[in-house]
């Protein structure tokens, strides 16, 4: 219903302003991925900086491919959108993006002043068909893929390896992200752990391997995991973990932070592990599509979203981690509750021993075992087909029970204050 009214309101504004499109900024972002109070602040700030009025039309999506289809096939005139890393890669190769003009006149360039050098290097690795992704996109949020686990039932040693996913000890207590891309990447790393250790292959090479052999390897492993799986989930897995219906969950760090906090309130000890064999990092970033109309307001929007105070507010609301390496951001999330870790790779040399939640920001020693995923391009259908074979045509009885229990629980909670204290809802990132 909320989404319906948002779309209706946007339609009314667009109709009223159809003759003034140059003063409208159409933003297309993930659901629940921003502190929405910053939107009117941007409108006022933009007029202060440029002397021109602007009205933001803010719309949301839940699946990368939905957004991409609207732009690639429908030629929708969104001015700024926020796709994931592999979609940025695909859009670059398809010539769907405009280069980002970083000239803001007398307005500070918050983008280049605050972007973490680690994130800049990662965007340099995006396969853009000869184009540098840093010239066409600016990071927004980032995170890792790891294992969320219940320390009451699973030891730190057991969860230090991806092989824990096929441990029969945890039958019917394992939840797996319904994301072929993320699952494939973690498992191919595990399966080639010895080659990695021997220097016969690199993480980057594994992330670019979409061969039939690689697909078959992962499929074989996951078919061993399948009998132990309680559910293939897009979003409900973290809730099952907080309620102790699940003990292990292949999950994203943002969901991990959310689940750990919620579980602690009811006395459940959830933790997050980055297995020793390696893991992947992911990114979402702002881009200006080729069919954009108000490119000036679009670049100012990206600049505004890179301002440290706005960054902090968005992180606090969404639970995800910004790409900003600004000292104000580090200060905001420093917490003496945590042991000191080395974040010099992200915030600079002075951050070599800081007390920050390691689920939000991995230690340098961990990040050195990380890999960056890429778009599969024409090989994507083969990945999707493998995933369908792994899951099978129908859901297991346990999966159906879990879904039913989840739905009943939501109803009983009365959507629990805008669904668990206004924290993020389903975000089918991949």
Q: Predicted segments — roles?
A:
Residues 18-94, 395-400:
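Early extracytoplasmic/lumenal segment of secretory-pathway proteins
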Residues 91-100, 132-134, 259-274, 337-341:
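Ligand-binding "clamshell"
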Residues 5-18:
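Hydrophobic h-region of N-terminal signal peptides that target proteins for export
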Residues 59, 65-68, 85, 89-142, ...:
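Hinge/lid segment of periplasmic solute-binding proteins
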Residues 175-176, 183, 187, 191-271:
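Ligand-binding pocket segment of bilobal, Venus flytrap-like solute-binding proteins
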Residues 289-366, 427:
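Mature extracytoplasmic/periplasmic domains
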Residues 353-430:
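Conserved C-terminal helix/tail region of periplasmic/extracytoplasmic solute-binding proteins
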Residues 108-110, 216-223, 266-290:
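Periplasmic-binding protein-like
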């Amino acid at each position: 219903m909320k989404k319906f009214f948002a779309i209706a309101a946007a339609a009314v504004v667009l109709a009223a302003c159809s003759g003034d499109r140059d003063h409208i900024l159409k933003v297309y972002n993930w659901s629940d991925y921003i502190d929405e109070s910053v939107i009117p602040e941007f409108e006022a700030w933009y007029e202060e900086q440029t002397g021109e009025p602007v009205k933001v039309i803010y719309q949301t999506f839940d699946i990368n491919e939905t957004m991409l289809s609207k732009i690639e096939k429908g030629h929708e005139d969104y001015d700024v959108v926020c796709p994931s890393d592999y979609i940025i890669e695909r859009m670059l190769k398809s010539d769907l993006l405009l280069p980002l003009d970083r000239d803001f006149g007398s307005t500070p360039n918050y983008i280049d002043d605050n972007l973490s050098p680690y994130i800049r290097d990662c965007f340099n690795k995006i396969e853009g068909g000869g184009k540098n992704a840093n010239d066409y996109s600016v990071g927004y949020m980032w995170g890792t893929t790891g294992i969320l686990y219940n320390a009451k039932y699973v030891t730190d040693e057991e969860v230090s390896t991806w092989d824990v996913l096929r441990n029969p000890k945890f039958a019917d207590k394992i939840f797996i992200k319904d994301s072929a891309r993320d699952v494939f990447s973690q498992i191919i790393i595990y399966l080639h752990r010895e080659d990695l250790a021997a220097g016969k292959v690199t993480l980057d090479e594994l992330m670019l391997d979409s061969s039939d052999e690689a697909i078959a390897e992962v499929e074989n492993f996951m078919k061993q995991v399948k009998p132990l799986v309680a559910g293939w989930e897009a979003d409900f897995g973290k809730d099952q973990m907080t309620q102790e219906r699940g003990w292990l969950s292949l999950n994203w760090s943002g969901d991990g932070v959310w689940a750990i906090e919620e579980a602690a309130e009811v006395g459940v000890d959830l933790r997050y592990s980055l297995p020793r064999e390696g893991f992947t990092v992911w990114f979402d970033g702002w881009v200006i599509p080729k069919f954009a109309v108000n490119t000036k307001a679009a670049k100012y929007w990206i600049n505004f979203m890179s301002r440290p105070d706005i960054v902090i507010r968005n992180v606090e609301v969404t639970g995800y981690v910004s790409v900003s390496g600004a000292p104000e951001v580090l200060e905001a999330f420093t917490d003496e509750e945590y042991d000191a870790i080395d974040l010099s790779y992200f915030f600079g040399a002075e951050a070599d021993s800081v007390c920050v939640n390691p689920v939000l920001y991995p230690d340098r020693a961990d990040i050195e075992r990380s890999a960056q995923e890429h778009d599969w391009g024409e090989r994507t259908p083969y990945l999707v087909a493998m995933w369908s074979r792994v899951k099978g045509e129908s859901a297991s009885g346990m999966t159906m029970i879990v879904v039913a229990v989840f739905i009943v629980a939501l109803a009983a909670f009365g959507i629990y204050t805008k669904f668990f204290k206004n924290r993020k809802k389903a975000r089918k990132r991949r």
